[in-house]
Amino acid sequence: MGLSDGEWQLVLNVWGKVEGDLAGHGQEVLIKLFKNHPETLEKFDKFKHLKSEDEMKGSEDLKKHGNTVLTALGGILKKKGQHAAEIQPLAQSHATKHKIPIKYLEFISEAIIQVLQSKHPGDFGADAQGAMSKALELFRNDIAAKYKELGFQG
């Protein structure tokens, strides 16, 4: 299920574009997640009160959290699958503290793909989309394995 060197290159090429505005991309990803899957908003006490897209766009806290999410994901992607050290604390906090189901990680993966498609169509063609999907699936599978070790049925 690993990615080829060429696939990792496609992932990291588009990720370079994301890093030019992590907070903006992250905010868009979270807004897309909350719009497509409103139930996910319930896991975020800090954002539950944000009812409209305009409120979400105006939230500095949402922007900061988007930056945090994509900074962590970027660190994981740059490890090209050798991300056990990065995954462990993330799985621990998402399983024991936040109680985030794996399904929600699938939802945010979809949101990431959609935001990249809309913001970077020239750098995110079918090959890059396929590579990013594989990279995000690898991440989710490894988080799910850690969840299982922790006894979390997410």
Curated annotation (Swiss-Prot):
The modification Phosphoserine is found at S4. It holds the Pfam family Globin. It is found in: Cytoplasm, Sarcoplasm. GO terms for cellular component: extracellular exosome; sarcoplasm. It catalyses: Fe(III)-heme b-[protein] + nitric oxide + H2O = Fe(II)-heme b-[protein] + nitrite + 2 H(+); H2O2 + AH2 = A + 2 H2O. The keyword Nucleotide-binding does not apply. GO terms for biological process: removal of superoxide radicals. Its EC number is 1.7.-.-, 1.11.1.-. Residues 2-148 form the Globin domain. Nitrite binds at H65. Keywords: Cytoplasm, Heme, Iron, Metal-binding, Muscle protein, Oxidoreductase, Oxygen transport, Phosphoprotein, Transport. Monomeric heme protein which primary function is to store oxygen and facilitate its diffusion within muscle tissues. Reversibly binds oxygen through a pentacoordinated heme iron and enables its timely and efficient release as needed during periods of heightened demand. Depending on the oxidative conditions of tissues and cells, and in addition to its ability to bind oxygen, it also has a nitrite reductase activity whereby it regulates the production of bioactive nitric oxide. This is Myoglobin. It comes from Spalax ehrenbergi. The lineage of its organism: Eukaryota, Metazoa, Chordata, Craniata, Vertebrata.
